[in-house]
Amino acid sequence: MDSLHVSSTSVLVDVVEAVETATSLVVDTAEAVATEQATPTAVISNALARSAYAAHTSLSYLAWAFGLWFLRLIGWVCYGIPTYVLGLLGRTINISLQFSSLLLILIALVTVVVAVVRYKYLTVYSRLPQEQPRQEPEIDMYDESDNEDEKTGFANYFDEFLSAVKIFGYLERPVFHELTRHMQTWKLSADEMVPLDDEQGFSVVVEGTVQVFAKQSSFVQNPTSVPDSRKEDSIMFNGERYTLLSEIKNGAPLTSLFNILSLFTDDLQLHKNFDSAVNSPMTSASDVPNMSLSSDGSDDLQKGEPQFGEPRLSEKPAAKLSVTVRAATDSTIAIIPAAAFRRITKKFPQATAHIVQVILTRFQRVTFQTGHHYFGLTPEIFQTEVNLNSHARNELPGYLREGAVKKLNQVYDASQMGGRPKKYTVTLNKKNKGKGSRRQRFSVQLNNQGHLNSQSRMVSLDSLEAVGDHMNPGDLLTNVPLSRQGRPVFELSSVKHKASIQNLSFSGNDDENEDTALRTALVEAIFKVLGIDRDSIQSSIMAVKTMSNTASPMFTGATTGGSSGSLGEELRSRRTGQDSLGASHFGVGLPSERSQNSFYARSETSTSSVDEDSLMAAPFDTIRNDVAQYMDVVLFKKDSLLIKQDDPTPGLYYLIDGVLEVGYTDHHKIYHDLYTVQPGGVGGYIGSILGHRSFADLRARTDVYAGFLPRAAIERMSDKYPMVHLTMAKSLTKVLSRLLLHLDFAMEWVQVRAGQKIYKEGQEADAIYIVLNGRVRSVAETKGDSGIVGGESGDAKDGKSHRKNLTSIGEYGKGESVGELEVLTLTRRPSTLVAIRDAELAKIPRALFESLALHYPSITFEISRIVASRVRTLMEDSAPIPRRMHTFDMAAHHDSYLTIAVVPISQDVDVSEFGRRLYNGMQAVGREACHLNHASVLNHMGRHAFNPLGKLKLSGFLDDIEDRYQTVLYVADTPPGSSWTHTCISQADCVLLVADARSEPDIGEYERVLVKMRTTARTEMVLIHPERYVPPGLTSAWLKPRVWVHTHHHVQMDLPRHEADVLASIRKMKRTGTLANLKNKVQTIQEEFRSMYRPKANIYSTSSANKDDFNRLARILSGQAIGLVLGGGGARGISHIGIIKALEDSGIPIDFVGGTSIGSFIGGLYAKEYDLVPIYGRAKKFSGRVSSLWRMALDLTYPATSYTTGHEFNRGIWKAFGDSRIEDFWLRYFTNTTNITHSRMEIHTSGYAWRYIRASMSLAGLLPPLTDNGSMLLDGGYVDNLPVSEMKAQGASVVFAVDVGSIDDTTPMNYGDSLSGAWVMWNRWNPFGRHPNVPNLAEIQARLAYVSSVGALEKAKHTPGVIYMRPPIDDFATLDFAKFLDIYRVGNKYGHKFLTELREDGKFPAIPGMENVKTKHKRTIARRNSI
């Protein structure tokens, strides 16, 4: 150190000397100049020389000094410091401290270390990154129709007319021109009245509003009984009083569906006996030998005799209504003359048949279906069949009837030789002779249960050979397909696919001729019932010939592609096309492209000529012979069910011998007898003609011998021979009851587009609406928050209006009604009704409802029951205290969806495979589903399906598909901008966005199309994972930028990741990466490439059917979800694990999970893992932490708010859930908490799981409330300890509710009007006291806290669809977590015992997907003219 100091001093001395030298040089130069002793040049030269020397000397010294200083510094570091350290270590230091001082130092040190560990390392859970809350989906109504009423002139006139003629379906250009060529218009002034005659034609209101009145004498039996309140709705016209039926506005037709059918079929003639019988006003029930109507069906069944007394239905068939119209305002009516419809029938018979089928379909949807399901007018509907059979006195000749009965009995007796049960249905089928045979076998499997729990089976025989000695006993039963299903299934079976059947035949040509005669007689008998005979067809032919020189294929049969053929060839070509359909492996049979497009091809050439001889040749024999090939003769034993209610009608039955009874089961599960069918009558007429599900059961009261004509044969016959179809439609118009005519005339068929408002909030309630097709949503504007994100006001500079705060009141699908309450109470609309997608509705005007209520009180009762049921549901669903959900509250309307669009996020997702698996899931849960993709639609409709002309045909086809199936899957397997993708989205009630969870959560091209289309349908996201594991925060990254997604699902499915995806990820990482994480990038890239070429085992895959993700998704989408609700109760909730194990052992699937307190913890683990093993381990670890006395003791704090800080409890929960969000749980999950800041219950479905589960478990006093956005949250059990109502609102149909709460002490108290504390203490400690212990302050406060929860629990026990379970855990206390195994075993034992008893008692609910559900047979889509 001393040497270093000396060297530094010498350096400084040298520097100072150099500076002094330079200074003296400057001074000398200045003096020389001042004294002028030298010249200036000399002075300057001398100065420069001296300055150069001085500078050189200074630099040398500086360089030398720096080098010396650096060398000495190295020496100090290498030698000086070690020497000093060694010297310091060699010294002896003595420190003297007292023990108390040392102890204080150690305590301080430990305190610092503990504080650092406690508040920095053990509180990671409290420092999780705060996420901005996701903007919840809002309800948007993209309606641009507010200013439509302002349109005037020709544009509005033409639009309204086109809107009205949509009722005809698709019209080709020649047909449209023919209809509108002679169109007329009427101008009506306000209050002007004119009679509306059917002969005038088809009328449309194109401007203004018109009121329709019906003659009161034909509508109300006693005109004087009209109350004064209805006088204002009635008028006097030509001396008659008329009652208001409806009010028609612009764009709606004035002509009813019935009148439209009459316009097309007026020139057709029916069987003369048909007209005379139907038009006879004296026809009564007593005159009808083949029909009977009983007022008390149960008595008739007991007596076993048909009744012919006075019927309770109107016997008089339909007659033309006397209707007049009055213009409420200045109005314009457009009329298409009746003559135009007659010309259409002659020139375009195939197009006419198509239009008539469309009208019949809408007549069935609007009038029949509404009358059956809504008004309860099933008896009036079946009065149609009563009127039809009233003239059917054409029984078979005795020898034919006796021969058929004898042969069927022989076959039946032969079948009994095998020792089989005695309940059979035997069918005699004609023998197929070689390849030239034109007959195919239609087998109708009727596998039903009779009144005596007997099964009805059908034996199909392909020949009519006599039963001889060559037949061995049991041959028949060992070779025929005997089905044991419990419900009838209609199946078209081709010859090449039929099962091997032992044939019984009647040998000899005489027997075959007799069989042919029998079938021919049966066909003629059915034709006569339908009004068809040789004379009526011949007269129609002559009428056409005399009225038109243009030949028509109306009677000779339409050909396909220029070739002619029989009905059998048509059926064979149709079946062959079905077998070749590419979508057949999906389990859906679609008609072939040829069979579908043949109609359109024929329609375009319907004006082609046929030679005159074909017109003169009567085709009756051809039609009869073709139909006879498909006529079966069947035997049904007593109590067999021929047609089941709500099942497709298999065909038309003509009764040869025996008695058939018709009855139906109403909404209250009460069976009603309607009438009986005697020999000579027909059954299944309405379902066969209209092609819809049956409204009633058709059962054999005795052994029944009948002729059976399959519905498919009727449909193909109607297509091949349009005249037959038109004649059947005319016969239907002749037998309708008067009440159905009034319904048809007053009810309006309304078609709305997606986003269109049907009515607005605050408008006067003038009608009830029933959804026929599509989906609508009821939306109300609520007061309060404006809904503007960021707090900006609605008065923006861009002039946009303030966004309304809308709330979804409900969604209504097919068959549901809306608006009854306002119509009955004469109040204004409380909400706005908007169409989610293109929809068809039936509008029931208030005037019609009031008029019907006067004459038919049963209608009033039905509507009153509906309204009362809805009011009761609203009252039951109303929460006792306000509640708030942290998500978009549309789950309450999560019913069964009819149409579901499967749309990928991007083209990299294999949506076809997903759609196929979802279709299989729908079938596994018992849904009748149809899978449509681009290929199947093109194969069915042809390559022009998506052209502007083909879209109308496609729309009709899709409507027909949606009417036949419970669920229709639209798979968007085409590019985003394609027509099929747009069709899938526009047709959907629910859109499933399918995404690969491994890809980047960017907005895909399909989503842009979805947003651009502005669809209002519910949108749900499906994240596909290769393993049953979701990384924390992944779901939130997908949902946050997608405000249009309402909810999400996690599904496990293998999706191969292509090399292009990996390279895209590499390029993205190159753009955004830095050198710091290069190693991680390389490792990630290596792992990506390995995953492409290396098979990877699924760590959480399961083969259990009850855990199949696609079955779960199918149950949720079809409204059949299974929910599990776990209640709170402290340590007693460990029994939840045992019950979950019992549920899994029983094969019960779980789709939704909800819980309170400890139930939220166990339920959250199950929803996250969806596996019992990790739940058991994590729950046991948590119980060990909570039961640790040391942990609880260290967590104690001053009891200002609670006894503990909550830290140990928080860590126990966080150890189980980590930083997972509720959205990351595999199953949909919710938990409830009590918000003591705003005094309400809150439902949590998103956010950090541990926080809201901890809040739901926060027992007041033991744990402090958890703060969330400024609110304090406590245990949800204070409000609802078993949140069953919320689970039902989420969409669960069956809920397993497990209650582990403490039992309420309801011991009666009687201690007088005053109470002494000393007496309470004495009574509590006195072992001989007779009074019950009086609760202390803490117990009273606890009872007050659980008051609302007790009421909610009692309500949950009696909620329909809830299976209440309470294990025997009353011996365990709330904090007995140390008894984990004991409590678990109690729950497991109780769960197995409870479920076993539930099965034995027959109370086990039907759970779809739990086992192999017996689904209906796959039905093919029979092509209809309505397509």
Curated annotation (Swiss-Prot):
It holds the Pfam family Patatin. One of its GO terms (molecular function) is lysophospholipase activity. The keyword Lipid metabolism applies. InterPro entries: Acyl_Trfase/lysoPLipase, cNMP-bd_dom, cNMP-bd_dom_sf, LysoPLipase_patatin_CS, NTE, NTE1_P-loop_dom, PNPLA_dom, RmlC-like_jellyroll. One of its GO terms (cellular component) is endoplasmic reticulum membrane. Its main location: endoplasmic reticulum. PANTHER family: NEUROPATHY TARGET ESTERASE SWS, NEUROPATHY TARGET ESTERASE/SWISS CHEESE D.MELANOGASTER. Residues 281-315, 787-807 are annotated as: Disordered. Belongs to the NTE family. A motif (DGA/G) lies at residues 1275-1277. A motif (GXSXG) lies at residues 1155-1159. Intracellular phospholipase B that catalyzes the double deacylation of phosphatidylcholine (PC) to glycerophosphocholine (GroPCho). Plays an important role in membrane lipid homeostasis. Responsible for the rapid PC turnover in response to inositol, elevated temperatures, or when choline is present in the growth medium. GO terms for biological process: lipid catabolic process; phosphatidylcholine metabolic process. Residues 82-96 are lumenal. It is an enzyme of class 3 (hydrolase). The lineage of its organism: Eukaryota, Fungi, Dikarya, Ascomycota, Saccharomycotina. The gene is NTE1. It catalyses: a 1-acyl-sn-glycero-3-phosphocholine + H2O = sn-glycerol 3-phosphocholine + a fatty acid + H(+). Residues 1-60, 118-1427 are cytoplasmic. The chain crosses the membrane at residues 61-81, 97-117. PROSITE patterns: CNMP_BINDING_3 (PS50042), PNPLA (PS51635), UPF0028 (PS01237). The active site is at 1157 (nucleophile), 1275 (proton acceptor). Keywords: Endoplasmic reticulum, Hydrolase, Lipid degradation, Lipid metabolism, Membrane, Repeat, Transmembrane, Transmembrane helix. Residues 1124-1288 form the PNPLA domain. This is Lysophospholipase NTE1.
